[in-house]
């Protein structure tokens, strides 16, 4: 059966920012079928550089897939912008599933 993904977004940790890096992660869990697309936007503009997607094997219990999409930036790049958005397109929804956060509210 088709399963709609659960999407969550996580800002970089304070520890990571202290060391000069910034990784934003979008978790997309328990979806089926496997065909899925994740798009990153920074302040509304699509960001393709520094993105790494990793899909897990099918879950043995419910046959769904999960994936993480990681956006890697430097701390300087990260602090230059405010709105970070992860958009997930899957056949279970006619419109993208969108999760975002404002850096100045973290």
Curated annotation (Swiss-Prot):
Single GO BP term: B cell differentiation
Keyword Disulfide bond in annotation: yes
The keyword Disulfide bond is annotated on this UniProt entry: yes
Disulfides per UniProt: 26-86
Pfam families per UniProt: C1-set
Gene Ontology CC terms: alpha-beta T cell receptor complex; IgG immunoglobulin complex
Assigned keywords, A-Z: Disulfide bond, Immunoglobulin domain
Residue ranges of domain Ig-like in the record: 5-102
SMART domains: IGc1 (SM00407)
Residue ranges that the Swiss-Prot or TrEMBL entry lists as coiled coil: none
Name of the protein described by the UniProt record: Ig kappa chain C region, A allele
Organism listed in the record: Rattus norvegicus (Rat)
